[in-house]
Structures are given as C-alpha cells and as structure tokens.
C-alpha cells in the first residue's frame, strides 16, 4: 500500500498537483505492480522560509541514508 507524500513550495496549481499525482500513481502501478486502489498520493505545501527546518533537516539531512534521490543543494543554499 504505497503512500507517497510530495512536499513542495506553495504556488503550483491544482491542475499541476493532480497531474503529478496521476503520474506518480501510474509509475507506482507499473514499477511496483500495485493496483490503483492501493496507491495514495498527498501534497504538502511548505513555505520557503520553513523548508530548511520542516523538510530539509527533518526529512533529508536526518534521513540521508534512506534517500533514493538526493537533492543537489544543502541547507546553506536555502
């Protein structure tokens, strides 16, 4: 039962978020062989001024060994 959480800055349209959720769902279904009913996708908007604390330090820096795609920036770039 994959549940994918996408954290992003505010400002993307509902259409863009829906399109991304559909693309993620399609890829999860194809690659991991789950049915559509098993996949859920959430979008969490985080303000740019909160990104370092709420996302980078909490979900990236402190979980570096769990990232399958690492960012090309660090906390000093924020």
Residue ranges and their predicted role:
Residues 2-78:
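A domain-level signal for the structural core that forms small-molecule/cofactor-binding pockets
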């Amino acid at each position: 039962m994959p549940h994918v959480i996408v954290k992003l800055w505010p400002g993307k349209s509902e259409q863009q978020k829906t399109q991304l959720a559909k693309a993620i769902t399609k890829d999860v279904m194809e690659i991991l062989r789950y049915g559509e009913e098993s996949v859920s996708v959430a979008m969490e908007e985080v303000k740019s001024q909160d990104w370092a604390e709420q996302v980078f330090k909490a979900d990236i820096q402190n979980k570096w060994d769990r990232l399958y795609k690492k960012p090309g920036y660090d906390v000093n770039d924020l």
